[in-house]
UniProtKB/Swiss-Prot annotation:
Record InterPro entries: cDENN_dom (IPR001194), dDENN_dom (IPR005112), DENN_C (IPR043153), DENN_domain_containing_2 (IPR051942), Tripartite_DENN (IPR037516), uDENN_dom (IPR005113)
Keyword Acetylation among UniProt keywords: no
Keyword set includes Cytoplasm: yes
Pfam families from the UniProt entry: dDENN, DENN, uDENN
Residues annotated as domain dDENN: 361-445
Main subcellular location of this protein, as a coarse class: cytoplasm
Residue ranges occupied by any cDENN domain in the UniProt entry: 226-359
Protein's name in the database: DENN domain-containing protein 2D
Domain of life: Eukaryota
Organism: Homo sapiens (Human)
Amino acid sequence: MEGQVVGRVFRLFQRRLLQLRAGPPQDNSGEALKEPERAQEHSLPNFAGGQHFFEYLLVVSLKKKRSEDDYEPIITYQFPKRENLLRGQQEEEERLLKAIPLFCFPDGNEWASLTEYPRETFSFVLTNVDGSRKIGYCRRLLPAGPGPRLPKVYCIISCIGCFGLFSKILDEVEKRHQISMAVIYPFMQGLREAAFPAPGKTVTLKSFIPDSGTEFISLTRPLDSHLEHVDFSSLLHCLSFEQILQIFASAVLERKIIFLAEGLSTLSQCIHAAAALLYPFSWAHTYIPVVPESLLATVCCPTPFMVGVQMRFQQEVMDSPMEEVLLVNLCEGTFLMSVGDEKDILPPKLQDDILDSLGQGINELKTAEQINEHVSGPFVQFFVKIVGHYASYIKREANGQGHFQERSFCKALTSKTNRRFVKKFVKTQLFSLFIQEAEKSKNPPAGYFQQKILEYEEQKKQKKPREKTVK
């Protein structure tokens, strides 16, 4: 059974890779189903308030295979149970639910009962046939009880990227599961009926717990929603600013990047952080925060990918036929493999600007929000300086349809090194998808990136009179 599921998922993945060579849609090894009734944006963090928090809560446990010593992960609890689905919807749901256990236990099938196991919080991403993404928020731990036992995973499937919020929800699920599975149901039902809050807003849930009474649980969405799906702390802990900059440079040119780490939490947090550095652009290729053992062949793919692999599979990865890969050891803070030109991809002046900004006041930061803003800011500013003038080079027809003037856009940059870089960057899917959306919209989106563009243009206007006065 498991081999059939893995084979089906992998065939879907291979088919998606072939599609990628021909066009721009997103892909992922966890391509499990298509959901036609809900259209999603390319970038995970951009979700409006009013959506449901989640689609499923699942408990995934390890079950011993018949006549074998190995274990297989299976779903032992599901909320809600979907009924009255059309045949096509039912088939899609079945594919999704068969794929999820592989990502909850990506380590493989060799397990032994344990008396101690450090709890881990991690996430994975499943990409649908239509390019939209579902996120699995996971808490893996050893259930309460005497004697040796096997870990299990609580997994919340949602279309919303807000990791801090879902980590708190997993805390509440875990607390209730220690009492009884029956106590989880009313909490999750209340959560399912609540609308996901808009940025900066709070939703309060009323929940009863035996022996504790009624509790009120407040879930607040960060005001700055473009960073709510990420935590840069792990990336800063594992790597230097210079190394992060080289990873960013590789990602900007859509190369193959593999992260290695022992822990699932470290892997998923670091890969999400690396992808978030690309804002306002979205990684459009294979994206697997933690690769299941059965899908390790992903690292041999000829197309771009950004994946995380557990350290136990390091030798298998190293022995795989790979070309032009950046292989990052997060445990040691080293690059095990690289192309060799990572330091030369970005314009030197702009590289220095990023490093200077990252180094200023880093020790004074106290909260996760402050760290996120501090790390993300210099990379957003890089894109503002390099491509912030894009809207001026979209010419529109009478019907409002825009056409990007690529050549004039590149020529507008006065720096030769900036122009050289941009001529490469405009050929990426990162930029192509961004410009395609801009061509459809009559006005630039009033988001965080546009705000930074306007601030930068205002600074330039104020700088010109001062320069004339000095002369």
